[in-house]
């Protein structure tokens, strides 16, 4: 698997994400600039957390106009795998690559803590190394992680199996306890929890490693289940 992490001005999880993919999961991973317009060399493109362009206007609202986003839309339309984490999730919704939107947390506070998740769909490119119903603990760190969608969209997400991760104890008010969703075709995932911060036992746990192992399995056919 060859992956790329888009490093926007204000991204602060890009190096963590590259480390998780390259050093821990053992795949190739480049940092690329938001001016890049050709993504055809990659199997997976990752949009990291942080505060892209200072989160002015609202989270992700400016980043979506970067030249790389037009290339990312083409990449996704061609079937390439895209994952947006935290601010990356916000950017993907702003760009129209994922349904719904991220609002201010229910209590209007920034939340930074580990949270319990449940795996809802283990049949995606991002979750095939987990089991349905498996319980995970991943860190969150966001002020605008409250997932919102209209009733029709929520119904479609549930019917189509697009909800991949769900909060066990909803920390931010997200509708249907949604922590991570895919697009309708299943090749784009957005999630608020940070899997790249949960890949080393020394730092608190390895529950996030399965996200990257799943992508390796999907792109290379190399089943690495059990390595966690």
From Swiss-Prot:
SUPFAM superfamilies, sorted: Class I glutamine amidotransferase-like (SSF52317)
Annotated Glutamine amidotransferase type-1 domain residues: 2-225
Catalysed reactions, semicolon-separated: N(2)-formyl-N(1)-(5-phospho-beta-D-ribosyl)glycinamide + L-glutamine + ATP + H2O = 2-formamido-N(1)-(5-O-phospho-beta-D-ribosyl)acetamidine + L-glutamate + ADP + phosphate + H(+); L-glutamine + H2O = L-glutamate + NH4(+)
Leader peptide range in chain numbering: none
This protein's pathway: Purine metabolism; IMP biosynthesis via de novo pathway; 5-amino-1-(5-phospho-D-ribosyl)imidazole from N(2)-formyl-N(1)-(5-phospho-D-ribosyl)glycinamide: step 1/2
Pfam families to which the protein is assigned, alphabetical: GATase_5
Catalytic residues in the record: 86, 194, 196
PROSITE patterns: GATASE_TYPE_1
This protein's record includes keyword Nucleotide-binding: yes
Keywords from the named record: ATP-binding, Cytoplasm, Glutamine amidotransferase, Hydrolase, Ligase, Nucleotide-binding, Purine biosynthesis
GO molecular function, one term: glutaminase activity
GO CC list: cytoplasm
Assembly and binders: Part of the FGAM synthase complex composed of 1 PurL, 1 PurQ and 2 PurS subunits.
Stated name of the protein: Phosphoribosylformylglycinamidine synthase subunit PurQ
């Amino acid at each position: 698997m060859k992956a790329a992490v888009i490093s926007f001005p204000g991204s602060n999880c890009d190096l963590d994400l590259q480390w998780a993919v390259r050093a821990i999961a053992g795949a190739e991973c480049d940092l690329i600039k938001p001016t890049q317009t050709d993504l055809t060399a990659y199997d997976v493109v990752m949009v990291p957390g942080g505060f892209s362009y200072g989160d002015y206007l609202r989270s992700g609202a400016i980043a979506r106009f970067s030249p790389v986003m037009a290339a990312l839309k083409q990449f996704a339309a061609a079937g390439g795998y895209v994952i947006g984490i935290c601010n990356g999730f916000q950017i993907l919704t702003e760009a129209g690559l994922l349904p719904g939107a991220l609002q201010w947390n229910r209590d209007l506070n920034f939340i930074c803590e580990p949270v319990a998740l449940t795996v809802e769909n283990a049949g995606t490119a991002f979750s095939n190394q987990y089991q349905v119903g498996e319980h995970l603990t991943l860190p969150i760190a966001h002020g605008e992680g409250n997932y919102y969608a209209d009733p029709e969209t929520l119904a479609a997400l549930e019917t189509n199996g697009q909800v991949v991760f769900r909060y066990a104890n909803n920390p931010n008010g997200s509708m249907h306890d949604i922590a991570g969703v895919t697009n309708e075709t299943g090749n784009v995932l957005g999630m608020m929890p940070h899997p790249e911060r949960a890949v080393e036992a020394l730092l608190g746990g390895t529950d996030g490693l399965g996200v990257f192992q799943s992508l390796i399995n999907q792109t290379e056919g190399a089943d690495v289940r059990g390595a966690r």
